[in-house]
Regions:
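Short, positively charged and aromatic/hydrophobic N-terminal segments
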Residues: 5-18
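A conserved beta-strand-loop-helix scaffold within acyl/acetyltransferase catalytic domains
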Residues: 77-84, 98-204
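A residue-level signal for conserved active-site and pocket-lining positions in enzyme catalytic cores
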Residues: 66, 132, 242
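Short secondary-structure junctions
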Residues: 29-32, 72-76, 248-252
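Helix-boundary/low-complexity linker signature
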Residues: 22-37
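Aromatic (often tryptophan-rich) hydrophobic motifs at membrane interfaces
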Residues: 170-251
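Active-site/acyl-donor-binding loops of N-acyltransferases
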Residues: 80-81, 90-97, 226-270
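Acyl-donor-binding surface of acyltransferase catalytic domains
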Residues: 16-17, 36, 40-43, 50-125
Length: 270
């Protein structure tokens, strides 16, 4: 009888220890802060305010939880908007298991039959910096994006630092040179699409489309159901490509990690 009581207590304490460990993983030590309002890049005339968490050692479990609740990650910084009087940023995710390829997407795959792909931990080389700055200079001329050359330190802090065991870069190589870099997180329930840049001299390859289609392929290989696309703002040209990858779900708001996120089926036509 005493042994039975001992084992009951042992099991209870084991469960409590596991629950506490789960809570610790979902609430890591962080430095929390907000930025002062600045001009919105998505809606002219609006102001942006971001809520940030700086976490030096975020677990995959934590990142999975917050990405599914509308947060984004750059380096060791996690963030989501808390804009005054505006809630236009909606989170999107692709339903991988039911994904449907369009004719134009199949053409993009065929056009990249000779494009070499490497998946590895994020890295920093002169080729990365050159390509990143070339792409943003092109977008400045074409779409009036704000632009200044990124330094190696800035690139490292944004795209290499904080990758831990889940961050990856997908390198696209053609003619023996780097022509595209896709930064992603491979999480417990999906792939979080962080940032993509490419060589505008290879615009005919539709690398932006192809990179997302490769994420679909990668997610299927890992048996992951979702690809998290980040934010969509109605009428914003920079996000116009996102609804083309169907089917999708949309999330309104940024629920706490203790709350279940309410994702619903969505298309831009609905």
């Amino acid at each position: 009888t005493n042994d039975a009581i001992f084992y009951d207590f042992y099991n209870i304490f084991s469960i409590i220890a596991i629950m506490n460990e789960e809570l610790d993983l979902l609430n890591p030590p962080s430095t929390d802060f907000s930025m002062l309002d600045y001009d919105c890049a998505y809606i002219p005339g609006n102001k942006v305010r971001m809520n940030y968490k700086y976490i030096s050692n975020a677990s995959k479990k934590f990142v999975t939880a917050v990405i599914a609740r509308g947060w984004r990650r750059f380096g060791k910084y996690f963030f989501h908007p808390i804009c005054n009087g505006c809630d236009e940023c909606k989170s999107l995710r692709i339903d991988v298991n039911n994904y449907h390829y369009t004719k134009s997407q199949r053409k993009a795959i065929r056009r990249n039959a000779d494009t070499h792909i490497v998946v590895q931990k994020p890295s920093l080389t002169d080729a990365h910096i050159y390509l990143y700055n070339k792409y943003h200079s092109f977008k400045h001329e074409k779409d009036q994006w704000q632009h200044r050359n990124i330094s190696q330190r800035e690139y490292y802090e944004n795209f290499v630092d904080g990758a831990h065991d889940y961050g990856r870069e997908v390198l696209y190589i053609k003619d023996n040179k780097l022509i595209g870099v896709d930064l992603i997180d491979i999480l417990d329930d999906g792939i979080s699409s962080i940032y993509f840049y490419y060589d505008p001299d290879y615009a005919n390859l539709s690398l932006g489309t192809f990179s997302l289609l490769y994420q679909v392929q990668l997610a299927r290989a890992y048996k992951l159901p979702w690809i998290y696309l980040g934010y969509w703002v109605d009428g914003c040209k920079a996000f116009a490509y996102k609804p083309k990858f169907k089917p999708q779900e949309i999330l309104d708001g940024f629920p706490h990690v203790s709350e279940e996120p309410d994702w619903v089926k969505w298309s831009v036509e609905s």
